[in-house]
């Protein structure tokens, strides 16, 4: 869609990332519009993101390109494409060059607890694989499929943020 827009516009175009640093990345037009509704006039709707994960960021400004942020495209895929063994994340550079390297980036507003076997009363559970039916929650993937879980991750984190706000869980 973006390529078609650029071709039909017949003028140069520049656009920053729509992601606000420190906030969740959006993978659906609805979530994006809700986040930006007071600061944009329109939204080009191409549907939900196919992959759901952040992009892989590669630093090619250095002598030996390296991965700054892991995403859906793997180190092996990039190395095969370039016919060069690209350095893994943080091996060559310690200086932060990409927002995805920050300790807190694309974070939900809701309080998250990782690796919980059983949620506390009133918590909302996000599971990888089935969870007990008596527990309020969402399942990234019933079949433990990594691609399905990746596609659903950010959308479900947005849902959990909304549910947490509705329950009064975010100050």
Provide a role label for each language-model segment:
Residues 1-171:
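Active-site-adjacent structural elements in enzyme catalytic cores
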């Amino acid at each position: 869609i973006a390529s078609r827009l650029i071709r039909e516009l017949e003028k140069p175009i520049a656009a920053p990332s729509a992601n606000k640093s420190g906030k969740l990345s959006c993978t659906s037009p609805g979530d994006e519009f809700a986040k930006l509704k007071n600061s944009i006039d329109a939204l080009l709707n191409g549907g939900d993101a196919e992959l759901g994960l952040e992009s892989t960021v590669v630093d090619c400004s250095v002598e030996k390109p390296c991965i700054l942020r892991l995403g859906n495209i793997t180190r092996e895929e990039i190395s095969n494409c370039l016919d060069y063994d690209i350095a893994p994340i943080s091996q060559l550079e310690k200086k932060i060059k990409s927002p995805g390297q920050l300790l807190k980036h694309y974070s939900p507003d809701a309080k998250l607890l990782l690796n919980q076997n059983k949620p506390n009363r009133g918590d909302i559970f996000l599971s990888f694989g089935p969870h007990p039916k008596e527990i309020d929650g969402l399942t990234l993937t019933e079949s433990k499929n990594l691609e399905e879980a990746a596609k659903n991750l950010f959308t479900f984190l947005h849902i959990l943020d909304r549910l947490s706000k509705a329950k009064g869980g975010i100050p």
